[in-house]
């Protein structure tokens, strides 16, 4: 995923932004250091691409028990108010968001990363393949990215 900011704290402090392929690199860190890396990405704005009618319908079908129930990341993405259930409040928030209106729920359009951060102790070699998974609250149809 491009344009993700990775904040590094610990024995050094810096940040980098992923390139168009989602790659990133921290350079010139002191050997043997202890670090925490935390990814963040600016939330979508109401009406922007990424959340649309298909997402609202997916959440509504889950709520009404029509078809295959949502699970995993899709279920998390549909539960925009984070109350552990997908209901009318979530569906309306997703609808309002893709129409360009405030959803009234702060999570709608925000990114969530897994893991939320990574901690490294005594780093003496390059740490490769340190990927994060991401979802966007409200993006029920295609919530995962790497």
In which residue ranges do the predicted regions lie?
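Cellulosome-associated attachment modules in secreted, modular CAZymes
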Residues: 1-146
